[in-house]
Amino acid sequence: MFIVAVLMLAFLIFVHELGHFTIARICGVKVEVFSIGFGKKLCFFKLFGTQFALSLIPLGGYVKLKGMDKEENGMNETTDDSYAQKSPFQKLWILFGGAFFNFLFAILVYFFLALGGEKVLLPVIGDLDKNALEAGLLKGDKILSINHKKIASFREIRSVVARARGELVLEIERNHQVLEKRLTPKIVAVISDSNDPNEMIRYKAIGIKPDMQKMGVVSYSLFQAFEKALSRFKEGVVLIVDSLRRLIMGSSSVKELSGVVGIVGALSHANSLSMLLLFGAFLSINLGILNLLPIPALDGAQMLGVVFKNIFHITLPTPIQNALWLAGVGFLVFIMFLGLFNDLTRLL
């Protein structure tokens, strides 16, 4: 499974670079090199004017676009298939292409898994508190709908309750009979993962817990599967952005960072193909978002450079750009080794 995990990580990098490659070709830009990995090229072949390579250090990848390096150095490239000759919108689209393909891959994984049937906890009550008891709910009740929205799995209950306002109308099945119950959610406050008493997470709850023995497979129509895929993608984005926010604000410890060892280790613990794909989809979203951060050497900083140059007409001198790029690479290497250190510390 470890080898499969490494291949999954390499595949996600391939997907990212394929995004840059595909959008560049659509925009009419020649791609000179498509490499998985950095450093010395271990093997390569040329096809349709592009050199495809596998390089020594498999911690990323890159595509080399015609005219991109010359533009960065302030030189002119006049041929039509040059990156330098493209419009600001096309440049932004090419730079965003990697993250876009990562996001698209995640959505497609979620879509096809939902379409093929998803193993879920059924919405059967295993335990309940006073609020639910007073509303007339009992252990073993199966929730069919909330406010006339059908419920297929227990995880759907929380999102429906969170969006609802006021009293809820629950349709339940008990002893082969369909009953209607009404209750008002309570606001529950808990301390966040940062253990800071001042940082509380508040959410609505109706006071029920699932019966962990009640599992089932839920199938979805094409539209439902697409809706489910977008919902899971949104959940992943919110979770990753919130984690980054807490890390930047200092409410999360840098000890929580994971490196390549931790990521591959987590992937290798997936005990089924669907679990591996789900983790891979989440990691793909992560890869896409991280590459959009405005850190020199990442796509986000290059996109910011295009905006400043073409909209605000601000261009930094080449030596400063090179210095920022080196600083960005240094920062990323530091983060990589910090994650690796955390991984090894956990193993020891």
Curated annotation (Swiss-Prot):
Localization annotation: Cell inner membrane
List of residues binding Zn(2+): 16, 20
Documented EC number(s): 3.4.24.-
UniProt cross-references to InterPro entries, sorted A to Z: PDZ_sf, Pept_M50_Zn, Peptidase_M50
Cellular compartments per GO CC: plasma membrane
Active site residues per record: 17
GO terms for biological process, alphabetical: proteolysis
Main location class: membrane
Disulfide-bond pairs as recorded: none
Protein's membrane topology: Multi-pass membrane protein
GO MF assignments: metal ion binding; metalloendopeptidase activity
Pfam families found in the cross-reference section: Peptidase_M50 (PF02163)
PDZ domain boundaries: 106-175
Membrane spanning residue stretches: 43-63, 93-113, 247-267, 275-295, 324-344
Keywords: Cell inner membrane, Cell membrane, Hydrolase, Membrane, Metal-binding, Metalloprotease, Protease, Transmembrane, Transmembrane helix, Zinc
Similarity field: Belongs to the peptidase M50B family.
Matching PANTHER family: MEMBRANE METALLOPROTEASE ARASP2, CHLOROPLASTIC-RELATED (PTHR42837:SF2), REGULATOR OF SIGMA-E PROTEASE RSEP (PTHR42837)
The protein's name in its UniProt record: Putative zinc metalloprotease HP_0258
Organism, as annotated: Helicobacter pylori (strain ATCC 700392 / 26695)
